[in-house]
Amino acid sequence: MWRFCFFLSLLFFDVSAVKSAESIFLPSQIGVEDSRVFESLSLSPVCSAADPNLNYKPVIGILTHPGEGRWDARLHSLKNYAYATNISYIAASYVKLAETGGARVIPLIYNEPEEILFQKLELVNGVIFTGGWAKTGLYYDVVEKIFNKVMEKNDAGEHFPVYAMCLGFEILSMIISQNRDILERFNSVNYASSLQFFKNVNIEATVFQRFPPELLKKLSADCLVMQNHYFGISPDNFQGNPYLSSFFNIVTTSADKDSKTFVSTIRSKRYPVTAFQWHPEKNAFEWGSSEIPHSEDAIQVTQHAANYLVSEARKSMNRPSSEKVLSNLIYNYKPTYSGYKGSGDDEVYIFT
């Protein structure tokens, strides 16, 4: 008897499975009425035409920084060494950030002859000023010259974005404020923080515009961004400087380890210029510090920041010859793995 019952249960299972399988149809197996449902879902997609107002092969120029990327107790001797040897570098995480958004990179070697440097600037659709320590000397002067040239391009009608991070934020603040002493000391080295959106801020046209609402909430409640700087600007001092307050809107602030508030994200009111005191590139691409956030939410912050950078660069109509671009791309250089040495960056491009 039990065998008979077992047989019936198997038979019932097989019939149910067959019916279930038969309920799954390919488009060619359904009737005319049902086929209309599939037609409404566009099973025969039409590829959209390219937008003539967008550049689908954007190139980002990244300015090199003096030195080899090492960051330790010998900082002052490293500064002297860097300037004496003419060595410069780019942390590979900045390159990967641009590539994540769909762009290629051309290194802008800061101590090359100015004529060559500005020839390369004509090959790119946007510029990144990276983190580092060089706030004086040739490096500062080169950042200022490039920034002024970029502003001329924008004033002439060319959309040319700037992305400035950490040191880049600080130097732009010094340049625009016309005050090299504008920076203040903060206890904000090597730690993760939240971002607090500034009062009455409108995030439209900012890096945060396309962030999902849930991620925007988490930015203010969780430690999703990496801070690594000794200097910054308080909101009061920022707003108290007429040049800064007329050029930039404060988008976010953050607090250091002593709960002192500093400006952490700014966006130009008129130009495609965004500056971060924090490091959007580190979450996904740097592993040397245990403080760097690597959660899925933190990685999304990096991805959205990269997408924004490149979406701005796509608006640039600068389209130089392919041959000139290819011969200057960073693919012509080899990165050096330096993470095992305890460097501040896992991977760097070194230029000698």
UniProtKB/Swiss-Prot annotation:
> Which keywords belong to this entry?
Cell wall, Hydrolase, Secreted, Signal, Vacuole
Protein name per the record: Probable gamma-glutamyl hydrolase 3
Q: Does the keyword Nucleus apply?
A: no
Q: Which gene encodes it?
A: GGH3
Give a GO molecular function annotation for the protein. Answer: gamma-glutamyl-peptidase activity
- Residue span, Gamma-glutamyl hydrolase domain: 49-352
Q: Which InterPro entries match?
A: Class_I_gatase-like, Pept_C26_g-glut_hydrolase, Peptidase_C26
Specify the enzyme's EC class, one word: hydrolase
Q: Where is the signal peptide?
A: 1-19
Q: Where is the active site?
A: 166, 279
Which EC number(s) does the record attach to this protein?
A: 3.4.19.9
Catalytic activity line of the entry: (6S)-5,6,7,8-tetrahydrofolyl-(gamma-L-Glu)(n) + (n-1) H2O = (6S)-5,6,7,8-tetrahydrofolate + (n-1) L-glutamate
The job of this chain, per UniProt, is described as: Cleaves the polyglutamate sidechains of folate polyglutamates in the vacuole. Is important for polyglutamyl tail length determination before vacuolar exit. Plays a role on folate stability and intracellular folate content.
Q: Where in the cell is it found?
A: Vacuole; Secreted, Extracellular space; Secreted, Cell wall
GO-annotated cellular components: extracellular region; plant-type vacuole
What the record says about family reads: Belongs to the peptidase C26 family.
Q: Which domain of life is it from?
A: Eukaryota
